[in-house]
């Protein structure tokens, strides 16, 4: 697969704007399309044009944006059960130096506001009532740790790996945060990350 950072770098070097926000996101094109990954005001759907994907029957299927169901926040429905193998994107021509400058500005903004330790990005979808990070902070859970998984002291909607964290460390921490949010604020937190394995139906 192709990392988003590589795609952003290629676009910048070739004077193609619209991909600046991708730099620094720890993901690959295929998974990012499924999740409609986004940051800094951009997302995958905004630059997506077409794709070839493997469906549940093992057949290759072509997808063109204008014939697909509209994307939602953190989901492109047509890729929920289809594995993207190849994708084409559309950008806007621009000056490579200006594009690189915006890319670097986004990178610095991300470094200043998001933890640099390994993580899966934002853990929870923002509920209507309050941003998830603010809620978790108000619950006093910044820095709360289970095993080697920790609620980031920098941004409470990130669960970071302090070193060799187990999947159970992360899922137990998610469980604890959700239970506290429900008990103390009456808010049900929905995970933004996709949990795969024995407990995936619970998230």
Q: Over which residues does each language-model region extend?
A:
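A glycine- and small-aliphatic-rich helix-loop capping segment at beta-alpha/alpha-beta transitions
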Residues: 10-16, 35-46
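Gly/Ser/Thr-rich helix-start
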Residues: 2, 25-32, 39, 122, ...
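Anion-binding (especially nucleotide phosphate/pyrophosphate-binding) glycine-rich loop
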Residues: 1-29
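Phosphate/pyrophosphate- and phosphate-bearing ligand-binding catalytic cores of soluble enzymes
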Residues: 54-175, 179-203
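N-terminal short leaders/motifs
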Residues: 2-9, 37-38, 73-79
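Short glycine- and Lys/Arg-enriched binding-loop motifs that mark or flank ligand-binding interfaces
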Residues: 20-27, 34-37, 117, 143, ...
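Core subunits and conserved enzymes of cellular information-processing
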Residues: 7, 23, 30-41, 82
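Short polybasic amphipathic segments
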Residues: 49-53
